Amino acid sequence: MKSTRSALFLTLALAATPALAQQNLNTISDDLVARAGQAYGNLDTVSGDIAIQAGSSVRNVNTVSGDIDLAEGATTARLETVSGDIEGGRKITASAGVGTVSGDIFFDHGSRIGGDLESVSGDIGLVGTRASGGIETVSGDITVGAGSHVKGGIRIEKPNGSWGLRIGNRKPPRIVIGPNAVVEGALVFERPVALYVHSSAKIGRVSGATARSFDTPTAPKD
């Protein structure tokens, strides 16, 4: 009887495995789609775009030049691309952070980012979003928009090596901390920037720049 039960349990476990496994999707140039409400493993492509539909769950998402688009309520761990853009709708969760080299990053109301948001030359924008880490870039613009909360700080690194030659002549990055936004950590600028902080915003210590206050819905143009 004991051996029969063991065999039965083994059969049931093997039968359940395919249903429990999360599917990995990989392509070179084709686009990938994570269907609404479904769970996936890793999504990887070189030049194809990746669309994560509403309510779907994906482990890690990686592209080289493709864009990553996340619909409302999508959940992921890590999002990474080299030159593609990452655009998140409302209530996105990225539990292990977000990174690009030259692609732009944006998240809308109700989104939660675990870890850092990082780029070399891409712009980073948040509206009504909470980030448990910080924001780092070299030459990209940063907007911590209305109602956003960044627990870490903001760091603009000094260009060096080949990156310094490529971006050394660009205009200073534009950093905007919008209405009712909070940046708990230090704001450290290793190169010149244009820093605008709304009168209702709360920020940590600033080094390397002088903040310009504004009380209009949007920051002044440079």
Predicted regions and their residues:
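Intrinsically disordered, low-complexity terminal regions
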Residues: M1-D222
